[in-house]
UniProtKB/Swiss-Prot annotation:
It comes from Burkholderia mallei (strain ATCC 23344). Residues 8-291 form the tr-type G domain. The keyword Cell cycle does not apply. The lineage of its organism: Bacteria, Pseudomonadati, Pseudomonadota, Betaproteobacteria, Burkholderiales. GO terms for molecular function: GTP binding; GTPase activity; guanosine tetraphosphate binding; translation elongation factor activity. Transmembrane segments: none annotated. It is found in: Cytoplasm. Its main location: cytoplasm. This is Elongation factor G 1. GTP binds at residues 17-24, 88-92, 142-145. Catalyzes the GTP-dependent ribosomal translocation step during translation elongation. During this step, the ribosome changes from the pre-translocational (PRE) to the post-translocational (POST) state as the newly formed A-site-bound peptidyl-tRNA and P-site-bound deacylated tRNA move to the P and E sites, respectively. Catalyzes the coordinated movement of the two tRNA molecules, the mRNA and conformational changes in the ribosome. GO terms for biological process: ribosome disassembly.
């Protein structure tokens, strides 16, 4: 079956923004104008097509990036039909993982900014992620009809805060309630959209007299930026500033955008149906097709470098970038095809797991509606049914020509909570639900706490875990109660305790019990638990020595201070005695346990707490606030450096986990939400005595 749309006319784009910049409304308008969606869904009615999880519709925020295919022939119908695959990405910092994984499979991005709020915190995070994956981008300043709208301030902020070179290709006509349309700086005409047709119809008009001078000033800047694309153009431009043709300007801006040198900038009001149509034209004019992007690199099964070009003639290769559970078809694997062709029913190799699987149905998604298709080709984004083994980040490829594409990296979870099923019936369903959710979301983990037997869930933030618990209830019918975030303390000793004995004797008629062990206990930093048998002359028979060790090992699970596990201790079994009739394994197990408890009390027991390596990326203006806040949390700052590309400062610190609860909220308020942080476990360290006392007292109160 020949290709319907040439790969040069594909655009795989993401629409990214800070929460509330109006990104979902913008996507809705795209679906409307491209004819996919005949009724405009409004976010504030909870009717937006792309926000298809119930929680998203309630909260009015986008959580899951949905993939949608649309077709566009240009605002004036003067382009050959282009196929646009849109990945909608969330704007909340707890869902950064979703943005990260969609950036990995995009060719270009449209950054949506609020005309009043401008470059906000999540905009900075998304920008860094786009830099990491070298994603070319255009900027759309939305909500130009709001009070306080300022297009040119946002243009400056992109330069100052993001170190991006924003090149306006439009300027607004009017602002706030007088916002009417835009001046197209390439055509040097004003575009006015018709309200009656919801912006489907528009007219080109002369530039309003009061804007002519400003339009010429910004056109000059745009043409100069275009001229820098090549020596020839620059020479032509320097000879005569008006000599560049419309086609030359567009081609030059396109070249520089794809090289990540400039960011073309547009504006509008998605809600008022103005500007989105021209933004779609800019997606076609300036963002790359899969053919404009370098070949994707990977390695074969022998670890030799390999690459795939975006062509149907190359062997099939694709990356699974998202897993979702669909109520009708079960598990959906979203994947991006980088090369080759695959049909439903074909056998694929999951090169990451080295397992072959048959590809069942292939679905093209429009938000949460689906259309079955027979095949996918290089550049396509689709969802597959029937792949049991695939997880996020896996490479799918031709079994005859294996390749493993660069793996996605996912951050470690930073917050944990205990979760308990409310009823026995919920118990079984909860395990299944949590495993399914963990499969969908690599930044969410599930484990069982050996000490308490509780199920512990870990994720990227409090909102993240809240939504997981909510999804368990809605999608799997599991009612669960959630505990407070917890810290896993440990206990150890500071000094040596020698000749400590444990004697377990029970002799009251009949067969008695007799076990007697003498031990030496010492610190064993960083080496865990060790047991040394130093018995001489058979004072304890050989067969009873493992029982002493077993008794101590059981006692390690609950220390003498607050019942936390004991780590990093060395025990020497030095002496003891036995009774020919009454000694048995159980008696020596008890003797070992008693000796260890007593030795621990004598060897100055201390509490250990987990220390976290914390990295904070912050704009320079907030350095003082960030450092002060870390110090107040018993943090030790270990270094600072400039972020590449001038994006502020990176602060490295070591902070106790116990002090990090509520940190994301506190960091947001200390930096107006413009800083982000990551945190991972580093090692255990001794807890200061005042903190240690509070923990021990709380534990004793808890035991009642």
């Amino acid at each position: 079956m020949p290709r319907k749309t040439p790969i040069e006319r594909y655009r795989n784009i993401g629409i990214s923004a800070h929460i509330d910049a109006g990104k979902t409304t913008t996507t809705e308008r795209i679906l409307f104008y491209t004819g996919v969606s005949h009724k405009i869904g409004e976010v504030h009615d909870g009717a937006a097509t792309m926000d298809w999880m119930e929680q998203e519709q309630e909260r009015g925020i986008t959580i899951t990036s949905a993939a949608t295919t649309a077709f566009w022939k240009g605002m004036a119908g003067n382009y050959p039909e282009h196929r646009i695959n849109i990945i909608d990405t969330p704007g909340h910092v707890d869902f950064t993982i979703e943005v990260e994984r969609s950036m990995r499979v995009l060719d270009g991005a449209c950054m949506v900014y609020d005309s009043v709020g401008g470059v906000q915190p999540q905009s900075e995070t998304v920008w860094r992620q786009a830099n990491k994956y070298k994603v070319p981008r255009i900027a759309f300043v939305n909500k130009m009809d709001r009070v306080g709208a300022d297009f040119f301030r946002v243009q400056r902020q992109i330069g100052e805060r993001l170190k991006g070179v924003a090149v306006p290709i439009q300027i607004p006509v009017g602002a706030e309630e007088h916002f009417q349309g835009v001046v197209d700086l390439v055509k040097m005409k004003a575009i006015v959209w018709d309200d009656e047709s919801q912006g489907v119809k528009f007219t080109y008009e002369d530039i309003p007299a009061n804007l002519v001078e400003l339009a010429h000033e910004w056109r000059e800047k745009m043409v100069e930026a275009a001229a820098e694309a090549s020596e020839e153009l620059l020479e032509k431009y320097l000879t005569d500033h008006n000599s560049l043709t419309e086609d030359e300007i567009k081609a030059a801006l396109r070249k520089r955008t794809i090289a990540n040198e400039i960011v073309p900038m547009l504006c509008g009001s998605a809600f008022k149906n103005k500007g989105v149509q021209a933004m779609l034209d800019a997606v076609i004019d300036y963002l790359p097709s899969p053919a404009d992007v370098p070949a994707i690199l990977g390695h074969d099964l022998d670890d030799k470098e390999a690459e795939r070009h975006p062509s149907d003639d190359e062997p099939f290769s694709a990356l699974a970038f998202k897993i979702m559970t669909d109520p009708f078809v079960g598990q959906l694997i979203f994947f991006r095809v980088y090369s080759g062709v695959v049909e439903s029913g074909d056998t694929l190799l999951n090169a990451t797991k080295d397992k072959k699987e048959r590809l069942g149905r292939i679905l093209q998604m429009h938000a949460n509606e689906r259309k079955e298709i027979k095949e996918v080709r290089a550049g396509d984004i689709a969802a597959a049914v029937g792949l049991k083994e695939a997880t996020t980040g896996d490479t799918l490829c031709d079994p005859g020509k294996p390749i493993i594409l660069e793996k996605m990296e996912f951050p470690e979870p930073v917050i944990s909570q205990a979760v308990e099923p409310k009823t026995k019936a919920d118990q079984e369903k909860m395990g299944l639900a949590l495993n399914r959710l963990a499969q969908e979301d690599p930044s969410f983990r599930v484990q069982t706490d050996e000490e308490s037997g509780q199920t512990i869930i870990s994720g990227m933030g409090e909102l993240h875990l809240e939504i997981i618990v909510d999804r368990m209830k809605r999608e799997f019918g599991v009612e669960a109660t959630v505990g407070k975030p917890q810290v896993a303390y440990r206990e150890t000793v500071r000094t040596v305790a020698e000749d400590v004995e444990g004697k377990f004797v029970k002799q009251s008629g009949g067969r008695g019990q007799y076990g007697h062990a003498v031990i030496k206990l010492e610190p064993n930093p960083g080496k865990g638990y060790e047991f040394l048998d130093e018995i001489k002359g058979g004072v304890i028979p050989r067969e009873f020595i493992p029982a002493v060790n077993k008794g101590i090992e059981e006692t390690l699970k609950s220390g003498v201070l607050a019942g936390y596990p004991v780590v990093d201790v060395k025990v020497h079994l030095t002496f003891g005695s036995y009774h020919d009739v009454d000694s048995n394994e159980n008696a020596f197990r008890m003797a070992g346990s008693m000796a260890f408890k007593e030795a621990m009390r004598r060897a100055k027991p201390v509490l250990l707490e987990p220390m976290m390596a914390v990295e904070v990326e912050t704009p320079e203006d907030f350095m003082g606030n960030v450092m002060g806040d870390l110090s107040s949390r018993r943090g030790i700052v270990q270094g600072m450096e400039d972020i590449a590309g001038g994006g502020g400062k990176l602060v490295r610190a070591e902070v106790p986990l116990a002090e990090m609860f509520g940190y994301s909220t506190s960091l947001r308020s200390a930096t107006q939400g413009r800083a982000t942080y990551t945190m991972e476990f580093k090692h255990y360290a001794e807890t200061p005595s005042n903190v240690s006392e509070a923990v021990i007292n709380a534990k004793q109160v808890g035991r009642g």
